[in-house]
């Protein structure tokens, strides 16, 4: 009689992710599990977003930058375009559409050539794309909150809504007629939803 032994599933790390080929497949790691989504354009060896997604990414980043320009130094920084983030205490890397990292997080980065941000952003923003799966977005949102991100925005370009997630609070949805709640760690930052879509 033979006994089959079950092997534990592989726990993926950032090093594993960085060693993967650049083959047009979008990959990220959540809770040590590899997530993959084939590119809409496999002949292009990079993550490709539609122009509406890209425009919204810029608008959100510009809105944060406008607020940031009113703040005293030292200030944090704004990142966009699938920023790779190493969240402390989490297994793996996540890609974020737009993120604001405060001055403390920015100050501890190794150098400007680092491809990944190490630390917890103050605000993360996910912009839904037509090929995003709701469960993947919810999983990423939960991962951000567990890692200590204070506020997560999930923007739906089709409905022109923003869903705001905060640890310990139920998610809140805001439409084009609303002002977003002020971020607790970003005094005075409370843009209207309309500003993000104008």
Q: Could you tell me what each predicted segment is?
A:
Residues 1-198:
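Gly/Pro/Ser/Thr-rich low-complexity, intrinsically disordered segments predominantly at protein N-termini
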């Amino acid at each position: 009689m033979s006994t089959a032994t079950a092997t534990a599933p592989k726990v993926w790390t950032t090093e594993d992710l960085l060693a993967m080929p650049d083959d047009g497949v979008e990959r990220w790691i959540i809770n040590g599990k590899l997530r993959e989504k084939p590119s809409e354009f496999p002949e292009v060896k990079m993550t490709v977003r539609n122009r509406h997604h890209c425009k919204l990414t810029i608008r959100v980043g510009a809105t944060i930058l406008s607020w940031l320009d009113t703040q005293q130094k030292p200030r944090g920084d704004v990142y966009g375009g699938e920023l790779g983030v190493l969240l402390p205490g989490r297994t793996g890397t996540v890609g974020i559409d737009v993120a604001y990292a405060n001055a403390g997080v920015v100050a501890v980065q190794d150098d400007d050539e680092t491809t990944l941000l190490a630390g917890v952003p103050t605000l993360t923003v996910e912009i839904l794309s037509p090929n995003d799966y709701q469960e993947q977005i919810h999983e990423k949102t939960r991962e951000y909150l567990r890692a200590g991100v204070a506020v997560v925005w999930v923007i739906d370009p089709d409905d022109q809504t923003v869903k705001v997630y905060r640890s310990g609070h139920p998610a809140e949805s805001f439409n084009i007629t609303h002002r977003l709640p002020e971020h607790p760690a970003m005094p005075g930052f409370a843009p209207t939803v309309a500003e993000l879509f104008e």
